[in-house]
Amino acid sequence: MAKVLVLYYSMYGHIETMARAVAEGASKVDGAEVVVKRVPETMPPQLFEKAGGKTQTAPVATPQELADYDAIIFGTPTRFGNMSGQMRTFLDQTGGLWASGALYGKLASVFSSTGTGGGQEQTITSTWTTLAHHGMVIVPIGYAAQELFDVSQVRGGTPYGATTIAGGDGSRQPSQEELSIARYQGEYVAGLAVKLNG
């Protein structure tokens, strides 16, 4: 049995929705045990609420538990072309895992969201840097998801990982195409994890 963690941060719910789709895809793979967790919120509760943050039900992960999984699929919104501060804070607490090599050889993949599309790919690839320092095996999705070839509408999705465009005010929710790409990412990574660890 390969253990797959979908680990995300979501303030307004876009990445939470994408995380569920990623987990849905991963759950299709026989021999994959899929868990969805989120990183802790770092904003004071009053500010989070005032900013319109969405209450979420996924359990909160601890950095130490990352070592328990064979594959981790990270989801983060874009903050100035980088991962969110909450995800950065969480990953900055993995120094002990780095020192012991606990994540070395584990699969890692990333999905993201942006307001207008700016920074989608940069967020994913800049997140890869931290994962590479852990010796994780980076898994992009390439162009295997057919939705990536559709240019008839505005949508997220890159060969690096699934993405969604939230709109400047956050009112746009992930489209069916974007969710399909996210499901593909989950299924693809989980399939690899089972082949390597199952």
Curated annotation (Swiss-Prot):
Cofactor note: Binds 1 FMN per monomer.
Catalytic activity, as annotated: a quinone + NADH + H(+) = a quinol + NAD(+); a quinone + NADPH + H(+) = a quinol + NADP(+)
Flavoprotein as UniProt keyword: yes
Keywords recorded for this protein, A-Z: Acetylation, Flavoprotein, FMN, NAD, Nucleotide-binding, Oxidoreductase
InterPro entries: Flavodoxin/NO_synth, Flavoprotein-like_sf, Flavoprotein_WrbA-like, FMN_Rdtase-like_dom, NQO
Gene Ontology cellular component list: cytosol; membrane; protein-containing complex
EC number, UniProt record: 1.6.5.2
Molecular-function GO term, any one: NADH:ubiquinone reductase (non-electrogenic) activity
GO annotation (BP), single: response to oxidative stress
Residues annotated to bind substrate: W98
Modified residues (N6-acetyllysine): K50
Listed cofactors: FMN
Sequence ranges assigned to domain Flavodoxin-like in this UniProt record: 4-189
Binding site for NAD(+): Y12, A51, D169
Binding site residues for FMN: 10-15, 78-80, 113-118, 133
Disrupted gene: phenotype observed: Cells lacking this gene show no phenotypes, however, N-trichloromethyl-mercapto-4-cyclohexene-1,2-dicarboximide and 8-hydroxyquinoline significantly inhibit the growth of the wrbA knockout relative to the wild-type, which is consistent with a role for WrbA in protecting against environmental stressors through its quinone reductase activity.
Family recorded in the similarity comment: Belongs to the WrbA family.
Additional remarks: FMN promotes WrbA association into tetramers, which are more thermoresistant than dimers or monomers, suggesting that multimerization underlies the FMN effect on WrbA thermostability.
PANTHER family (UniProt xref): FLAVODOXIN-RELATED PROTEIN WRBA-RELATED, FLAVOPROTEIN-LIKE PROTEIN YCP4-RELATED
Record note on quaternary structure: Homodimer and homotetramer; in equilibrium.
Role, per record: It seems to function in response to environmental stress when various electron transfer chains are affected or when the environment is highly oxidizing. It reduces quinones to the hydroquinone state to prevent interaction of the semiquinone with O2 and production of superoxide. It prefers NADH over NADPH.
Protein name: NAD(P)H dehydrogenase (quinone)
Classification lineage: Bacteria, Pseudomonadati, Pseudomonadota, Gammaproteobacteria, Enterobacterales
Gene (UniProt): wrbA
